[in-house]
Each structure stands twice: as structure tokens, then as C-alpha cells.
Amino acid sequence: MSDTETPGEHPVGIDTLLDRIRTTYARVEPQDAYDATRAGDALLVDIRYAALRDRDGLIPGALVVERNELEWRLDPQGSHRAPEATGHDLRVIVVCNEGYASSLAAASLHQLGLHRATDLVGGFQAWRAAGLPVTR
């Protein structure tokens, strides 16, 4: 056992980790995410790198937060929270490029008490492929 392992736990690969995480909440399809944000029922949070946003465009109305700042910006108790981080009952839909990093990010938000956090199946690429709004 390594110094970082918990007794009784075994290391897992990223695919297994994602599978485990994704069983703890319902992920959202692009059209459902669009409808929820238009209705004011969810906050869409784009965690893609600036280079990807520059290359592919932005989702109108999405809060852009770099992945390495996500927890600090969305923690309702944090001193660096975004104005949109209104409480632990906030429904957050995290968007990355293809829907992988966003699953890990949503799980991290759950640990902060944002239990309605989820992510977008297929990420930004699925959003764009569905013909949903993108700005340059």
C-alpha cells in the first residue's frame, strides 16, 4: 500500500472512477440543459480552457470559470465566490469540452454541498452538435 492509499481501498483507473462518479447523480443532455438555463432553473458553468473557448466559441449566458478556480468561485461560503453562487441549493450544470472533466468537477461540487450539481453529457461539443446557441 502506498502512503496516499486509504486502508482497504485499491487504486482505480480514470474510466472506473468516472463510472462510479456518474452513478451518484443524473447527467444532463444538451437540450435539457438549454431548457433549464432558459427557464432560470440552472446555472451553466463553462470550465473549458481559454484556448478552447477562443477556438470554438461561448455558450451565451454561461458563467465562465477556469477549472482550477471552480470550487472557490462556486462555494456559497467562500470568500472568492461568484455572485451567481447563491446557495447550496443552486442547480449547477458544468460544461467541459467533451463531458469528462465536467463529471469530476460536478463530483467535487457535491463535496462542497452543491448536491444539485451535474454535468453536460458530451460537453460543449455535444451542445454545438445539437445546434444550440454559440457565440464567437
Where are the predicted features?
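Rhodanese-like catalytic fold shared by cysteine-dependent sulfurtransferases
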Residues: 1-42, 50-91, 100-136
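Active-site flanking residues adjacent to catalytic metal/cofactor-binding acidic residues
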Residues: 45
